[in-house]
Amino acid sequence: MRNYISIALLLLASSVFAYDPPTMGWSSWNTYRVNISDKLIMKQADAMSRNGLKEVGYKYINIDDGYFGGRDASGELITHPVRFPNGLKQTVDHIHALGFKAGIYSDAGRNTCGSFWDKDSLGINVGFYGHDRQDADYFFKEIGFDFIKIDFCGGDAKQNFDQLGLDEQERFTAIHNAILATGRKDVRMNVCRWNFPGTWVHDVAFSWRISQDINPSWESVKNIIRQNLYLSAYASEGKYNDMDMLEIGRGMSEEEDKTHFGMWCIMSSPLLIGCDLTTISEKALRLLKNEELIALNQDVLGLQAYVVKQMDGVYILTKDLEEVNGNTCAVAVYNSTDEERTIHLDFADFYLRGDVSVRDLFERRDLGKYKDRDFSVTIPAHGTRIFRLDGLERGERTVYEAECAWLQDYQEIRNHKAFETAIYEDDGNCSGGAKVTGLGNRDSNYLEWHNVYSREGGLYLMSVDYQCAENRELICQVNGVVVKNVEAHPAHEVASEQIEIRLKPGMNRIRLSNGNSWMPDIDRMVLQKK
């Protein structure tokens, strides 16, 4: 069997395009909430050291909410007198001695989420607010933590006793700067705002939550996948969308657990185990140690799979592996429905040509070589199948859906209509079943494809598919140069305008914008080499 983890590590060492991969490890919140202790954390670290998880890439042991004991007279944090009577340093030293990295938790406001929702009274007035430099020095210079999850209950007036409403960008940026001021450049900061907070987060965090808290149910997993389907553009340059901690081994069916883990892997979410590692079942452990799925998550390109097509609740997603526009890609067929479905894969959707070798990554076995439209798969209800495809050659990508594009003003924490920010929206008339609406009316509210690949460069005919109920205009830029102002005429279905553009060899950026008025809704862009 091919050792995909070894291949990924080799490429990581040699490729100039390699990025730090998503965080892998264990976190205390899902199973224990605030009911933790130093002994419990060390037992979990010991278990992760014994059961082979370290060898496949899990290396962070994260202490979530529940360790706080208030502050002393000088404002320094102190730990819970019963749960952590000896402080945090002893626990962190134990974690480090096992060869792991240690993570911690705090809040951008005054109180933690546990103090409000779990009535953990010692979690009041322990957040970063008013103590940014002091707490950063404590966590990262004095104690030696390597990771931090930062919540926002203390900044959300509905979730703190002071009814304190804070600005997310200001608070998380200030904390980011305080961490940098410690001299530590290796700390991974996770922003926990429970929805995509805005593109500013890419500049301050290693990862960010895109949904409400997970729970061990199919509806929760399905909803989180749904929220992340069209966020692939924001997982870039070694920064990742966080789908929340894993609920593997906590009561869902085998197929649901497989979908949960497989989709977290191919969508490049952090992989933080949330169950009790001292009692984990062999079946759950085997899934969590699947090296071939982990290799998708830890791939050197750091890409999140994007939606190629959807068919009545079945989604096909893909991403390149090891080399951009190379001959290898991963494909997930995800069945969100309550019925078994049979799907035929068309390898042309992935631009693979000739015989294609197919490997099932759940079963960890080769399925043989297939030609275009010759491969079908049956997916049970709530199930997912993930394949590695190796083709003889690869054509250039020609279709770029709008829902795969970067929206500069995109955010999900406030009403997009009130704040006039663009958003992804389902629309059965559009090619991929979705579009981008609410674009334009200011310079920053634009759409941009960051990853338009051309092998040789040259002239292309670019077709922009759109919808609008009235005459509208968009400005097309290629690599920062305005190419054309496009007049879009009323089209309740989908209409198209064509533009001749020139691409350079390698990666290109194509932007659609209008700083003065509203743009049409954008369905997709199609490129044809001239």
Where are these regions (language model features)?
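N-terminal signal peptide c-region/cleavage motif recognized by signal peptidases
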Residues: 13-15
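Structural recognition of the beta-strand scaffold that forms the well-ordered cores
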Residues: 22-28, 57-64, 101-106, 146-151, ...
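Glycan-recognition and catalytic regions of carbohydrate-active enzymes
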Residues: 272-337, 416-440, 506
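Glycan-recognition surfaces
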Residues: 125, 181-276
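Aromatic-lined carbohydrate-binding/catalytic grooves of carbohydrate-active enzymes
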Residues: 40, 44-161
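Aromatic-lined carbohydrate-recognition surfaces of secreted/lumenal glycan-active proteins
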Residues: 100-118, 176-198
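Carbohydrate-binding surface patches
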Residues: 264-267, 272-274, 310-352, 382, ...
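Extracytoplasmic
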Residues: 341, 352-358, 365, 369-530
